[in-house]
Amino acid sequence: MTHLPKLAIVGRPNVGKSALFNRICKQKIAIVDEAEGITRDRLYAEGELFGLHFQVIDTGGINARSKEVFNEEIKRQAEIAIEEADTIVQVVDAHVGLTELDKEVARVLLRTKKPVCLAVNKIDNLSQTSLMHQFHSLGIKQMIPVSAAQGWQIAELLETAFEKISREIESQETFSSIKVAIVGRANVGKSSLVNYLLDEDRCIVSPIPGTTRDSVDISFTHKDECYTLIDTAGIRRKRAEHEVVDKFAAIRTERAIERADLCVLMLDVQEGITAQDKKIANTIEEAGQGCIILLNKWDLVQGFRMEHCLQNLEEEVPFLRHCPKIFTSAKTGRNIDKLFPLIQEVYANSQKRITTHQLNKFIGEALQKNHPPMIQGKRLRIYYMAQVAVKPPKFILFVNYPNLMTDTYKKYLYNQFREAYAFTGVPILIHLKGKTKKDKPVSSLSLTRKQTKSTDQENNEYDELYQEQRVSDEDYYFENEEDLTEK
């Protein structure tokens, strides 16, 4: 597995650590705000400088005097980052000047005997470098003036930080990992799950909602398979969105869902299905993501009955009926061993392809079992079906007139398709396409016999057809059996 050199960014609160982290990573990962204590967990991302790839770790502000409820946890997270880092950058604020907290942080870093570089932040040009002199007393020999906001001197800072780090740490081995977003409303146990899976306190765990504010990416290996867990900030009720940070965190959670390969939706069975749970479930569905549902804390409910919980879940979020469910306790690890096989299964299903030959055989058998009904003397005719995309699996069903497809028959086809191909944990998108000049009417019952060309030839021809045809007013689609709408 790749072992990249690690750079930890540390310092007192509100000196620009997260802004520097984002600048090095060249993307907005950490939430940046003027308020103190925004970053709480350790954030990891990959950076690159002149061909050298490395990991960057953003930490919360170290403040021994703070009364902030999470201060001890933030400090511990920073200490863990310092321990695992190969090189360290302490960030200070040139305009605020040297503070006692800066001195305390420097003393801690120098005791590690690791390479330490001082980033004197908020210096926009060389004319302001005189502001650096006050920091010489910290005892850190390597000092670089930088502007995280403007991107000035960032390359020079990184060169200095990695000057004494051997490139032998870095392996050129590449690997692909399955990105799994751990999502759910605030305080359902997401960080407890991540910490149990990793067997370390990577994320701050607290009964106070909103503990995790950033989306924390964590890469690791389990049974020779590579995974990246994305521990997201819980989406809270709207009344809490007066905090700008919580609003940013909710947006970051939605982005995490979009960039993940699949999602693990955590629910608290003690409180049942809430409006926030439904909102997150809808976000997963709209993103077309595969999903596994973890029903957490069921061991804390007296007289708990699984069948009642599953029935309630199906009634509240019927569009996730296809998703596998696990009753678990993230705190004790009960049934967590079932999660990884399901991740592999759902991920494989999201990329599964079915040949046009197999799909047309399926359509022929479905039509033989149950013919479409007559509508005003006309009957729906299905010409053929083909898959056009994966993640999520997407299919086009070519018919004579889409408006002849009744709701009952839509449900029938959907259920038959699920029964034939399962696609456990993955949404299925099936689009209806109206008749075009290129479609020759054929008997719907002859679909299983019309095999005059190879499957590969059919797939190539149909792929070209989809690219040429434009979506018309007659196009319809349905996602799962209950969500068929006109486009």
From Swiss-Prot:
Family matches, as SUPFAM superfamilies: P-loop containing nucleoside triphosphate hydrolases
Keywords, sorted A to Z: GTP-binding, Nucleotide-binding, Repeat, Ribosome biogenesis
Domain EngA-type G stretches: 5-169, 178-351
UniProt cross-references to Gene3D superfamilies, sorted A to Z: 3.30.300.20, P-loop containing nucleotide triphosphate hydrolases
Domain KH-like per the UniProt entry, residue ranges: 352-439
Keyword GTP-binding: yes
Keyword NADP assigned: no
Region span, Disordered: 441-466
Example of a GO MF term: ribosome binding
Binding-site residues, GTP 2: 184-191, 231-235, 296-299
One GO BP annotation of this record: ribosome biogenesis
Binding positions (GTP 1): 11-18, 58-62, 121-124
Assigned protein family: Belongs to the TRAFAC class TrmE-Era-EngA-EngB-Septin-like GTPase superfamily. EngA (Der) GTPase family.
Role noted for this protein: GTPase that plays an essential role in the late steps of ribosome biogenesis.
Subunit structure: Associates with the 50S ribosomal subunit.
Name under which the protein is recorded: GTPase Der
Natural source organism: Protochlamydia amoebophila (strain UWE25)
